[in-house]
């Protein structure tokens, strides 16, 4: 397995400088990561560094709370796509989900999917650590119904990250048709492989270089 191709090499800290963004883009190029995942303000710079490579640029939208209006998420999506984003990782309106407002959730996701249509794929972050089992299932069902290309466990900025149990549940819920991304707290090869075995088709990580080096060490001599 080439674990690098599963990885969105991620840097979403508020104090990430241009130098930091250049570092993750250089690493992504060298290691062959699937993408880099950055905040909107860093999309244009990351795109300029990765043009002509296979590495995609993913941008977060409505991040990390998901608690802005749909119109704001749509504008943000349109803006980052114009600046070079090929993937969108958006956060759902978690309160609307907890209130049972399924129509609002679908409207919110579908608006982003529609504006991204043909230009970027959309991953929907459900922030699983804040949800009950029933809410996790419903969030995944609604994301799939709204046309999302992936469901994603976590922002990495809340009370918990990805778990194998959540990945299994999410994969069982959405079936084979769309992707499942584990993100938050995946810092070593063993954890990354456990997520993939449970059904993840993408991994979000900041410790990506360490994960890939673990894989190289494990296969050395074979």
UniProtKB/Swiss-Prot annotation:
Q: Which UniProt keywords apply?
A: Cytoplasm, Lyase, Schiff base
Gene it is expressed from: deoC
> Can you quote a single GO CC term?
cytoplasm
Give the metabolic or biological pathway.
Answer: Carbohydrate degradation; 2-deoxy-D-ribose 1-phosphate degradation; D-glyceraldehyde 3-phosphate and acetaldehyde from 2-deoxy-alpha-D-ribose 1-phosphate: step 2/2
Return any one Pfam family short name. Answer: DeoC
Organism in which the protein naturally occurs: Alkaliphilus oremlandii (strain OhILAs)
What Enzyme Commission number does this protein have?
A: 4.1.2.4
**Annotated compartments:** Cytoplasm
Q: What phylogenetic lineage does the species belong to? A: Bacteria, Bacillati, Bacillota, Clostridia, Peptostreptococcales
Please report the name of this protein according to its UniProt entry. Answer: Deoxyribose-phosphate aldolase
Which GO terms fall under biological process for this protein? 2-deoxyribose 1-phosphate catabolic process; carbohydrate catabolic process; deoxyribonucleotide catabolic process
Residues forming the catalytic site = 89 (proton donor/acceptor), 152 (schiff-base intermediate with acetaldehyde), 181 (proton donor/acceptor)
Q: Which InterPro entries has this protein been placed in?
A: Aldolase_TIM, DeoC, DeoC/FbaB/LacD_aldolase, DeoC_typeI
Q: Which family does it belong to?
A: Belongs to the DeoC/FbaB aldolase family. DeoC type 1 subfamily.
